[in-house]
Amino acid sequence: QKLTGDLATGKAGLEGLTALAGATTTKLEDMFAAAGNVGNALGEVGAEFKTPEEKAKAVLEVMKGVAAFGQEGAVEISDLAKQMAKVSAAAGFFEGDRSGNLLKMTALAQLARQSGGAASATQAATSVLSFANILRTPARRAQFKEAGIDVDSATQKGQLRDPISIIKEALTKTGGAIEPMKKLFANVMGDKPVTALATAYNKAGGGDAGMKAVDAMLAKFGGTMSDSQIASNNAERMKGTAAQG
């Protein structure tokens, strides 16, 4: 937890993060750096969290989700861990639950890499930060307003609406047509997560069928890596190490 200076949280989360790093063959330093970025995004002990243990548990839950998404998507956690600063920064602009937003941004990064045209984990993470910045740029905001789409939170001043809701509304309002979508998300990097969902929407024929395809795509990124799977992966790894030794 060198990035947060939160030693107590780092100590409380050490065992869980070490096990997760082993189970996903992620370098410890990358796992801890990623967890530090997630911890920064989630909040502070004494404010959002009562104890270091409570914060450490919340950080681990997010990281287990990120690991599970790595199994479903195109970017493994060992690669994405190095990019969590960008994903965490993007998550901070949206309304609602911080943990949930981190996982939504991670899912969008996975989709950007899988079928949105992002060529690497670095590009995928950059694309979600660019996506958040699109929604904060005056020229783009004017385009959304013109299309009848409100990108601002109705309940949290200064925050953006749920990112998935914004994309879905854009697809509905434009019918998924390429030109109107490009007009809204006019950023060659930031439109990559949107492109992945728009492609699924259009392939299914748009409308209700298209939205079902979008929901099915997003549903893949709803799980977590269970404690039993982490233990099993580590046991297999230890067996392999013993056999080699």
What is each model feature region?
Residues K2-G206:
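Amphipathic alpha-helical interface segments used for oligomerization, scaffolding
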Residues A12, G117-S120, M225-G245:
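Hydrophobic, low-dielectric interface segments
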Residues L108-L111, I178, A213, K220, ...:
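Short amphipathic alpha-helical surface micro-motifs
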Residues K157, G175, A209, F221-G222, ...:
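Feature targets compositionally biased, intrinsically disordered low-complexity regions
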Residues N187-S232:
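Long, low-complexity, polar/charged, intrinsically disordered or flexibly structured peripheral segments
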